[in-house]
Structure formats: structure tokens, C-alpha cells
């Protein structure tokens, strides 16, 4: 009997299974970064197995933190109201939903930032994401504190929108990761120059969010091994060991780790393990593991590979084409393949809300009615 379908207490939630929907950018918000009605349908469909945790796509904490067209935000009243429709629909299915709080930093589109408010392209340092990319401006210390306040306000907005909690996006080469890793952060002030200095932004953001909404409504995501968007410091272990130790002290709802075999949305050949982080973090909270999992490897992760931890498996792309995914895993029903060509088509329901539930799931729902 696998632990994958045994309950687990996470923060303020009582999950019925240990499969979470991992965060995935889909660009189905309006041009003003307001969630469209199809987003409500999309998340409600994937909440259909009661007691499942969904983590939203990356959602910008403020207008200046954006720079991606048709990505949602959580910084104004229209966005909060639209997200409330989403969270109500998810809760009506008996499931849970966290919003992923996001500041883009140097990979943002500078033209879009200018058009949407005259905002600069910024980062920890004036270090471009690649040789042919624009060079960002380094944030001043005064600005850093203002951005930390943006995270806290976004967390409060999330609770107002009905979210069960928030996940701080500290992974995949976005702004927090740009402070964390020395491949980007070349600062010599208190926000860089050492393991402690580089970790400071992530930890100050975490503390501010915890103060705003509570540790039991806060998670954080790290990707120590990812090469996505110019990341991967030479030896990430000391940096992320320190973050693990310090994060463990905060008593968060969970920590979310990206396996080395995933770089952004791509599969890569990699064998670097997360054991070093887990040893430093201990058993401070449940841990979500994400990275190319299928039904078989998800069972192995919770029962064997991470059996000593309260492990949750984050599954992304297969959840797109299998809205009843936890039911399929539990009942040995094959996954429907996804269509990568529809992943990022702005505002389009095709490949978004048109994937069917399995016949077996539909029968189970009818029988329970």
C-alpha cells in the first residue's frame, strides 16, 4: 500500500493525497494581467479529486515585478476579485490552492515593463541573463526593501482572494534566485558577497510573508541545480545548505524543491541529488519534490527515495492533459499525452480546458452523486 494516497497535514490543510499540481506558466490571463474565466475552469477541473493541493502558475507581486505578457498578477482589486472566483471554484471541489508569488527580474521583457508603467529591468546586479540579453540595473537597498514589502502585500492580497496560502518563487532564475546565486549576484554590500549576504533577500522576503499571513500559510520553492535562465553557480551546496538551515527555522507549511533533471520546462540529463539540502533542512516540514514524475516514479519517491520525509510529489505537465490525475495514478489509468504546442498560447482555451476526464472517473463521480 503506497503512502501516496494517505492523508498529510500541511500548514492549515489536510491533504487527502500526496500529489500536488506543480506551478506552470500558461499565459491565460488578460492583457491587464487579470485571470480570465477560463482560468477558473482550468483550476476547478484539476481540483476534482478532493483533498488535492494545486499551486498556481507564477503570479506577479506588483506591476514593476512583471514583464511577461498575459501572466497573472495579484496586486490590484480586479486581480484579487478574479482570483477569488478561482479559489471558490477549487474549494467547491474540496481541494486546496496556493498562489506562487513571483518577481521576474532580469528575464523580463524591458519593452513591456516600459509600456506598462515605465519600469526598469532590474536584478541583484547589472548582470545579463545571456550575452545577447539586455543588462538589468542593480536594485538599490531602498528599492530592495520596497520589493520585500511588495511580497508581503501580495501575500495579504492572496489571503483576501481566498488562497489557502502562498508559495514564494525562489527558483528557476527569477529575482530571488538572482540574489541567491553568485553567477548573477556580484554585489559587495549586505545583499551579496557571501553565502549569508546572497541568502538575505530570500530570507527577508520569507520573514515578511510569514509576518503578513503566517508561517502555516507560506511555502517556498528552490532549484539548487537548475541551469535555467543563466543559473547554476559552480557549487550550489554551501549556498543552499545555508538557506535550508535558515528556512527550517521559519516553520513554513512546506519547502518545494526542483530536481536536477528539470531546467525550467525542459527535461535534462542530470544526476545531482537533493540529499545535501534535506540533511540541512531536516524534518522541519513536508517537502514537495518536482521534476518529471510519472505515476510509477511518484510512488517510488514517497515510498522509497524520500520515505524518511513527509514527501509530496509535484506533477506539472501531465496534469495539463489529465485533470483527474490523482485518480488515474491511484487506479492505474494511463495518462493522456499533452500537446506542448498549446502550453503558452495566450488566452486560448485549446489545450487548456478541453482535456477530458477518464470514463472511470466520470463513473465514480456519478456513483457518488
UniProtKB/Swiss-Prot annotation:
Question: Sorted alphabetically, which InterPro entries does this protein's record hold?
Answer: Aldolase_TIM (IPR013785), OxRdtase_FMN_N (IPR001155), Oye-like (IPR045247)
Residues the entry annotates as binding FMN: 23-25, 58, 100, 169, 292, 316-317
Write out the function statement from the record. Chanoclavine-I aldehyde reductase; part of the gene cluster that mediates the biosynthesis of isofumigaclavines, fungal ergot alkaloids. The tryptophan dimethylallyltransferase ifgA catalyzes the first step of ergot alkaloid biosynthesis by condensing dimethylallyl diphosphate (DMAP) and tryptophan to form 4-dimethylallyl-L-tryptophan. The second step is catalyzed by the methyltransferase ifgB that methylates 4-dimethylallyl-L-tryptophan in the presence of S-adenosyl-L-methionine, resulting in the formation of N-methyl-dimethylallyl-L-tryptophan.
Catalysis: reaction(s): dihydrochanoclavine-I aldehyde + NADP(+) = chanoclavine-I aldehyde + NADPH + H(+)
Enzyme Commission no: 1.3.1.100
Q: Which residues bind substrate?
A: 169, 172, 344
Cite the annotated pathway: Alkaloid biosynthesis; ergot alkaloid biosynthesis
GO molecular function terms listed in the Swiss-Prot or TrEMBL record: FMN binding; NADPH dehydrogenase activity
Biological processes, Gene Ontology terms? indole alkaloid biosynthetic process
How is this protein organized at the quaternary level?
Answer: Monomer.
Q: Which cysteines are joined by disulfide bonds?
A: none
**Protein name per the record:** Chanoclavine-I aldehyde reductase fgaOx3
The annotated active site, in chain numbering, is 174
Amino acid at each position: 500500500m503506497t503512502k501516496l494516497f494517505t492523508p498529510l497535514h500541511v500548514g492549515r490543510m489536510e491533504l487527502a493525497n500526496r500529489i500536488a499540481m506543480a506551478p506552470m506558466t500558461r499565459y491565460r490571463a488578460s492583457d491587464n494581467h487579470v485571470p480570465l474565466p477560463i482560468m477558473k475552469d482550468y483550476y476547478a477541473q484539476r481540483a476534482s479529486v478532493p483533498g488535492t493541493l494545486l499551486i498556481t502558475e507564477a503570479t506577479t507581486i506588483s506591476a514593476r515585478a512583471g514583464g511577461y505578457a498575459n501572466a497573472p498578477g495579484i496586486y490590484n482589486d480586479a486581480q484579487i476579485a478574479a482570483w477569488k472566483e478561482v479559489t471558490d471554484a477549487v474549494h467547491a471541489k474540496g481541494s486546496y490552492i496556493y498562489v506562487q508569488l513571483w518577481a521576474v527580474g532580469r528575464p523580463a521583457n524591458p519593452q513591456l515593463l516600459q509600456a506598462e508603467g515605465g519600469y526598469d529591468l532590474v536584478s541583484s546586479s547589472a548582470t545579463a541573463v545571456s550575452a545577447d540579453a539586455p543588462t538589468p540595473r542593480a536594485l538599490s537597498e531602498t528599492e530592495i526593501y520596497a520589493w520585500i514589502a511588495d511580497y508581503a502585500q501580495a501575500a495579504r492580497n492572496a489571503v483576501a482572494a481566498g488562497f489557502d496560502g502562498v508559495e514564494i518563487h525562489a527558483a528557476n532564475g527569477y529575482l530571488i534566485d538572482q540574489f541567491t546565486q553568485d553567477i548573477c549576484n556580484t554585489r559587495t554590500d549586505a545583499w551579496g558577497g557571501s553565502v549569508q549576504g546572497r541568502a538575505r533577500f530570500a530570507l527577508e522576503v520569507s520573514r515578511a510573508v510569514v509576518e503578513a499571513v503566517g508561517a502555516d500559510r507560506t511555502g517556498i520553492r528552490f532549484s539548487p541545480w537548475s541551469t535555467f535562465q543563466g543559473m547554476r553557480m559552480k557549487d550550489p551546496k554551501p549556498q543552499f545548505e545555508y538557506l535550508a538551515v535558515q528556512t527550517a527555522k521559519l516553520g513554513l507549511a512546506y519547502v518545494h524543491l526542483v530536481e536536477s533533471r528539470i531546467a525550467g520546462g525542459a527535461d535534462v540529463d542530470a544526476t545531482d541529488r537533493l540529499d545535501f539540502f534535506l540533511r540541512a533542512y531536516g524534518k522541519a516540514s513536508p517537502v514537495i519534490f518536482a521534476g518529471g514524475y510519472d505515476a510509477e516514479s511518484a510512488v517510488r519517491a514517497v515510498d522509497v527515495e524520500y520515505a524518511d520525509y513527509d514527501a509530496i510529489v509535484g506533477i506539472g505537465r501531465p496534469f495539463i492533459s489529465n485533470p483527474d490525475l490523482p485518480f488515474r495514478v491511484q487506479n492505474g489509468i494511463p495518462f493522456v499525452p499533452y500537446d506542448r504546442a498549446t502550453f503558452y498560447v495566450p488566452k486560448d482555451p485549446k489545450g487548456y480546458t478541453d482535456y477530458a476526464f477518464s470514463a472511470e472517473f466520470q463513473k465514480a463521480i456519478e456513483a457518488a452523486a
